[in-house]
Design a protein with these regions (language model features):
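Metal-dependent nuclease catalytic cores in nucleic-acid-processing enzymes
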Residues: 172-179, 332-340, 427-431, 475-495
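Mg2+/Mn2+-dependent nuclease catalytic core
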Residues: 163-167, 465-482
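Phosphate-binding site recognition
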Residues: 1-418
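Acidic-basic catalytic patches of nuclease active cores, encompassing PD-(D/E)XK
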Residues: 405-438
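Active-site metal-binding core of divalent-cation-utilizing nuclease and nuclease-like domains
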Residues: 132-137, 429-455
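Conserved catalytic cores of phosphodiester-cleaving nucleases, focusing on short active-site segments
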Residues: 426, 450-465, 479
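Structural motif
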Residues: 142, 457-459, 493
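Domain-level recognition of nuclease-like catalytic cores that cleave nucleotide substrates
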Residues: 484, 488-512
Length: 512
């Protein structure tokens, strides 16, 4: 079986007999029921391949669809002129970079359909070439845009250039409304929705199917699709890792499944990671390794975000679908980028419960954040395995000595809320070690800062900033934080830690 890793061209995939999860029923449904669509999905989730599938369909290439769902659904197989804009590969961090890319597309189309000197702007040229294409071919045109938001995402740190990109895109896309009579179908994709309102404000008939129940599995794959299409590969993966087929499916599910794009829907597997795992026969963080979420980290720092909240974030429909909210809330972009997903829904308060979709994303994201809190590297005193041994063995003194060295080695400059920084750092340490960790756990008499559980020990940790370790330990006792574990057979260890905002490290610690 040939796995289409990196293959984003539908014709290439079909003619070279790569494995394909049939999504053509969605192609027919979209073309049959509507005209203008927008789809938001994380990167490497199959958006480009789906656009290419649409392109082949509107080119009337019936032979490519033999054996697929749409083959007998469609009767006409007409050919339409297609304007396919791919913004995924270009660099938009320089002035005029977006203009250059759009100009290149227009120049190529004008060679085929003609140009006019009076069309002085990108928008006017686009408007003119659409009309001439429709007149020349005798039919309406199809417009496909891949990664509409790439110019906006790449200029988060340059508001002036981002505003320039937005203005150009808004004028360019406004043509889709003014030239409606010449357009048969339009489909636009992106990672995020922010900017959609300002960029597409003139295109008020754009249907957003990102959270539409009918299109949840339009990209990616369900467990049923995984098992039905890749049974041979699953068996090979099981044999290579000494597991049964059932255990292998469970491992794939835990590591790569878990994306939910609407409440009460089945999970969707990350196709890129699944295909790489079946090819290389090893479970690794393939999706995460292809792109580091630098802009998301910048957002978290900008908003002084509490990392523990990422596993219990609650958000309304308006929030996770909001746009242009970077200045007030990082959650919409983090969700839309695929680092958070819908884990549940509170019917009473109409709130989505968000969290990491799977192990790949959680472990990858937390490990990516670690260098922000320590000079982590091969020579760093922060060695996860040593921390794990200390905590599992019930050696808090050793653990605290390593923790002190961990902060002492840190070159990161604490900005803003120092207490938040230390809390985030401790949370990262314990989560990366793989321990059950809760932060600010409510009790009958207050909130304990950090609770860590292993098979043999329960650690109750109270932290103070510019206070004293004794004060922290006293709070554990006075608030009776250990009471809920009185009947637990595990040993309870109480730790009081005092951090210094001046030295940016552990000033003192005390065991109880």
């Amino acid at each position: 079986m040939k796995y289409p890793i990196g293959i984003q061209n539908f014709e290439d995939l079909r003619r070279n007999c790569y494995a394909y999860v049939d999504k053509t029923n969605f192609v027919y449904k979209l073309a049959d029921e509507g005209k203008y669509y927008f789809l938001s999905r994380p990167r490497r989730f199959g958006k480009s391949l789906f656009l290419s599938t649409l392109e082949a369909y509107f080119q009337g290439k019936k032979e490519l669809f033999e054996g697929l769902a749409i083959y007998d659904m469609e009767k006409e197989w007409k050919k339409y002129p297609i304007f396919h804009i791919d913004l995924n590969t270009a660099n938009f961090r320089e002035k005029d970079s977006l203009y250059i890319v759009l100009n290149d597309y227009l120049t190529a189309w004008e060679k085929k359909y003609g140009a006019r000197e009076s069309e002085a702007t990108l928008a006017l040229r686009f408007k003119g070439v659409i009309a001439r294409a429709a007149e020349k071919e005798g039919c309406s045109v199809v417009i496909l845009v891949d990664e509409y938001d790439k110019p906006i995402l790449q200029t988060l740190s340059d508001p002036e250039l981002q505003a320039e990109h937005r203005a150009q895109l808004k004028a360019f896309y406004s043509v889709l409304k003014t030239q409606d009579r010449y357009i048969k179908f339009a489909f636009l994709t992106g990672v995020t929705k922010f900017g959609k309102v300002s960029v597409f404000s003139d295109l008020n008939n754009l249907t957003d199917i990102s959270m539409d129940y009918r299109y949840i599995s339009i990209c990616g794959m369900t467990e049923k699709e995984l098992v039905e299409n890749f049974k041979e590969g699953i068996c090979q993966l099981a044999e290579a890792n000494g597991d049964t087929e059932e255990v292998t499916i469970a491992k794939l599910k835990a590591r790569y499944d878990g994306y939910h794009f609407e409440a009460h829907t089945e999970g969707i597997f990350n196709p890129f990671s699944v295909l790489n795992t079946l090819t290389k026969l090893r479970f690794k963080d393939y999706w995460f390794e292809t792109g580091t979420p630098t802009f998301l980290v910048d957002l978290l720092k900008m908003h002084s975000y509490r990392l523990p909240d990422m596993t219990k974030e609650r958000a309304s429909d308006d929030v996770i679908n909001s746009v242009d909210s970077l200045s007030t809330n990082p959650i919409p972009v983090i969700y839309q980028s695929g680092y958070l997903t819908i884990k549940g829904y509170d019917e009473r308060f109409k709130k989505y419960l968000l969290g990491f979709p799977n192990k790949e994303v959680e472990e990858g994201f937390l490990n990516f954040l670690l260098p922000l809190y320590t000079s982590a590297g091969s020579e760093s005193p922060f060695m996860v395995d040593e921390f794990v041994r200390d905590v599992e063995a019930g050696k808090p003194e050793q653990f605290l000595k390593r923790l002190t060295a961990f902060f002492a080695s840190n070159s990161y400059q604490v900005a803003g809320d120092a207490e938040l920084y230390f809390q985030n750092a401790l949370y990262l340490v314990f989560k990366i070690m793989g321990f059950y960790t809760q932060v600010e756990l409510p009790t009958s008499e207050g909130r304990m800062d950090i609770l860590v559980k292993t098979s043999d020990y329960i650690y109750i940790i109270e932290c103070k900033l510019d206070g004293s370790a004794e004060e922290a330990l006293q709070q554990i006792d006075s608030k009776n934080y250990a009471a809920p574990f009185a009947m637990d057979k595990r040993t309870v260890i109480k730790l009081g830690i005092n951090f210094s905002s001046k030295t940016r490290g552990v000033e003192s610690w005390k065991l109880g």
